[in-house]
Amino acid sequence: MAKGLLVTYALWAVGGPAGLHHLYLGRDSHALLWMLTLGGGGLGWLWEFWKLPSFVAQANRAQGQRQSPRGVTPPLSPIRFAAQVIVGIYFGLVALISLSSMVNFYIVALPLAVGLGVLLVAAVGNQTSDFKNTLGAAFLTSPIFYGRPIAILPISVAASITAQKRRRYKALVASEPLSVRLYRLGLAYLAFTGPLAYSALCNTAATLSYVAETFGSFLNWFSFFPLLGRLMEFVLLLPYRIWRLLMGETGFNSSYFQEWAKLYEFVHSFQDEKRQLAYQVLGLSEGATNEEIHRSYRELVKVWHPDHNLDQTEEAQRHFLEIQAAYEVLSQPRKPRGSRR
């Protein structure tokens, strides 16, 4: 069935960062890339506005072809090469955050993550690359920079160069049912976000505070578009919701689960509820004056400073960071409800 340009633009506008239009066009690798990067940080999604006609034409041509081009090498694309390097670094950073505690992380997990990121970009559209050679380049480069986070960059560059040298057109395959494609994409999405969610659940309060601030700042960008903001919130918290549904509350250590619950509330209601939580942390009632907020903050910082609690450093650090975050929230001028500024 021929793909329509108007339908593609509609899906691009409604669910572009989630890759709905690519799913419609049969570009599953591109859809997965957009799911994992939220449309290339939004920039790739916007840039595609002018590329959609060529994507639709390419999808319709593929339906009419009976065999893929043989002996023809796709043209070299600097944009694809740059995207391979960037996504490889991105996958490596995610692995560094979520899997760095693994034994032989710099030998196995890091090059595998970077190589898969490079291969994902290489498989966008009607092109692909050699799986073994690309991963082989990543694994051969990794020991040279063993134990150094900077290893992500040379591994990504080496894998990207190899992927470009081995680039080729995809072989034509019979179309698969949508349910099978969605199942495969869902597994890939969970494989990427699962370790990251687990690390966030079991990591220190510093990581939780950083993630909360990042999510809150990101969601604030969508304050002008409530529906889109709720969609982004749903996507960001989807791994947590799935994990909680499967594991239940018994699957978490109680103290860390309570910390994540606070983070969840922080993100889920990032304006009014965020301030209410900040008041609770500082032990104040809602509507306290700036002087009361500052006084409570100074008193609690003295009590919970890690240098003053050497016998319970971890708990002191958690409270100290919560107090710092709460004070920053309450120090910001409150936006009136319904305001557009």
From Swiss-Prot:
Question: Does the keyword Transferase belong to this entry?
Answer: no
GO cellular component terms attached to this protein's record: membrane
Cystine pairs: none
Q: Does the keyword Chaperone apply?
A: yes
J domain spans which residues? 277-341
| A Pfam family it matches | DnaJ
Q: Which residues cross the membrane?
A: 5-25, 30-50, 81-101, 105-125, 135-155, 185-205, 218-238
InterPro entries the UniProt entry points to = DnaJ_domain, J_dom_sf, TM2
Among Gene3D superfamilies, the record links this protein to: DnaJ domain
Topology versus the membrane, per the UniProt entry?
Multi-pass membrane protein
Task: Name the UniProt key words of this record, in alphabetical order.
Answer: Chaperone, Membrane, Transmembrane, Transmembrane helix
Q: Which PROSITE patterns match?
A: DNAJ_2 (PS50076)
Q: Source organism's superkingdom? A: Eukaryota
| CDD domains linked | DnaJ
Which positions fall inside the TM2 domain? Answer: 3-50
Q: What does this protein do?
A: May function as a co-chaperone.
What name does this protein carry? DnaJ homolog subfamily C member 22
